Amino acid sequence: VLVFYWVLKTVVLGPILKLLFRPWVEGEENIPDEGAAIFASNHLSFSDSIFLPLMVPRRMTFLAKSDYFTGRGPKGRLTAAFFKGVGQLPVDRSGGRAGEAALRSGLRVLRRGELLGIYPEGTRSPDGRLYRGRTGVARMALEGGVKVMPVAMIGTDKAQPTGKKIPKLMRIGVKIGKPLDFSRYEGMEDDRFVLRSITDEIMYELMLLSGQEYVDMYATSMKDRILAAAKTKARELQEAALPGTAAKELEDALDASDDAPPRRRGTSVDDAAADIDEDTAAEDGPADSAASESADGDASASGRRAAS
């Protein structure tokens, strides 16, 4: 596995990607020459997990969702072989015991003195903004006794938006901030308020590095809202297409057109999504402590906003 990783990075895939995308790095001097560390990055695109390890001289391991390792057919087997070959670890995101297993997998990487990549948001941003971090990254940093390197991926969402299989040829950037030391909280990894405070500090640094707008709600909650809006719109369109259902509405609109001002057009799915900007952290509610231990940080507790 280790040999395959270095062959891909330095001989096969790495040189081709560097030639095509001409990636740039800012803050390379902050990368530790030795010892374990967590690289906590924003998450804009699938290609983040390719370009970040490519631009870091040392080997980096990411905790990848288990779906990548269980696909069927030629494509599924090829995907699983690739992720195993580059040293990625499968993670079950269902929470509970699965979250605990993910935490232990990450800690094993750190205790070997290696670099571990984590996306505190837990999923890709649905709209390019930075979302509230999950506290698993904080717990892993405290239990592993390691520093956290804030990382901002630049332009990967434009090169490979969600749903696009082949990335657009354009320059990709990686910004690596100064290491964050949380040793002052040693022994407090079970304090949910400490975990929230650490996570918010990490997200604040990511906001400064990336220049992204910060939204104090979970990215998964935003995705749920966008999906719900899309389903509602689809139902409305389906109902409007039924025979006879639109006729009476049209007659009413024509009758009222002389007396009433023009009606506002229906809200599109994109409009509905754009309207969801308010602070909704309270709606997420405190998560249970078991879920807080997942590799993507599948837990949280109510706490300070990252920008506070």
Could you tell me what each predicted segment is?
Residues 1-20, 72-87, 165-171:
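Alpha-helical membrane-targeting segments
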Residues 4, 100-308:
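Non-catalytic C-terminal accessory region of glycerolipid acyltransferases
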Residues 11, 23-28, 47-49, 76, ...:
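A generic local structural motif
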Residues 23, 58-59, 89, 113, ...:
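Secondary-structure boundary/capping positions in well-ordered alpha/beta enzyme cores
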Residues 18, 31-96:
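Catalytic core of membrane glycerolipid acyltransferases/transacylases, capturing the structured
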